Amino acid sequence: MVHHDPIGLIAPNTGLAQLNERSRDIFRQIVESYLATGEPVGSRNISRLITMPLSPASVRNVMSDLEQLGLIYAPHTSAGRLPTEFGLRFFVDALMQVGDLTETERQSIQTQLASVGKAQSVEAALDQALTRLSGLTRAAAVVLTAKSNVRLKHIEFVRLEPEKALVVLVAEDGQVENRVLTLPSGVPASALTEASNFLNARIRGRTLAEARLELETALTQSKAELDQLTQKVIAAGIASWSGGDSDDRQLIVRGHANLLEDLHALEDLERVRLLFDDLETKRGVIDLLGRAERADGVRIFIGSENKLFSLSGSSTIIAPYNDGAGHIVGVLGVIGPTRLNYARVIPMVDYAARIVSQMLGG
């Protein structure tokens, strides 16, 4: 399933629904030429490309109509035409046929992930998935994963100073997270040991969110058995896991260099520079990708439909992936110029998300 944003962008009263076959054919050729070359295309070339015999003058008349509908425009540097963002959205929604992946492409993604199926961490597997996805699409690949969905294995307190300790949290997939914890005054080594034992008896196999709920309940029920300082250490440990929602999200970006390929002008280089700046805005990228967690299937944002990348004129194609229980635990996809090969990239993102879901499901 493919979701387009924003829903309802193509209004039925715009006249687009009444485009005849000739107009659609000419518009399709303009878009496909742009996606292939990034260059404006003129009426003479269009008249050679379309299936029906039309003179360049007749093609120009149709192009004028398409321009009035807001589907194409004339850049100031050329007599040819390019699709507008609105035109690209119409093409993706109404005219484009999404193809199937070739067997070679499927095998390429499967093989890359199979090679890391026994990797030390899910993060390593996702990194490999992104490397393959960016290589196949020639765009930047991104993944947003929730650390809080990792299942816990072990916790340990290591005293650093009289009133500071390092909390070492080890996950079942091998990930290790360290946080510095401020200790209540006068905590003895025995209280740290007792707190570790109490926590380890209750967190194994649970996600961070599940562990928090379990421990808050268990702490209330076990107050009579624990001395006051140990209770404070446990409470401080739980609180340290709740700090900062951005820490619960992990963003990985691969394939920046792909965006530097096939640049046609200084204007293209400036767009890529702006996109690089956007990708460094971690909070914005996380917010964008987080939108895909609320729906199944592939979502497509073209140009200014996504405020984060509006200046760089970039498109984003993203899809959620699930864990073994069928819960959405992250989002992956690609970010690139608006002239992405949508028909090819959409099934790649969809397939990669499904393979990652299968891998996480065991």
UniProtKB/Swiss-Prot annotation:
InterPro entries: GAF-like_dom_sf, HrcA, HrcA_C, WH-like_DNA-bd_sf, WH_DNA-bd_sf, WHTH_transcript_rep_HrcA_IDD
Swiss-Prot/TrEMBL GO biological process terms: negative regulation of DNA-templated transcription
N-terminal signal peptide: none
Matches recorded under SUPFAM superfamilies: GAF domain-like, Winged helix' DNA-binding domain
One function term, GO molecular function aspect: DNA binding
Key words, A-Z: Repressor, Stress response, Transcription, Transcription regulation
Pfam families reported for this sequence: HrcA
Similarity comment: family membership: Belongs to the HrcA family.
Role description: Negative regulator of class I heat shock genes (grpE-dnaK-dnaJ and groELS operons). Prevents heat-shock induction of these operons.
Matches recorded under PANTHER family: HEAT-INDUCIBLE TRANSCRIPTION REPRESSOR HRCA
Protein name (database record): Heat-inducible transcription repressor HrcA
Native source species: Nitrobacter hamburgensis (strain DSM 10229 / NCIMB 13809 / X14)
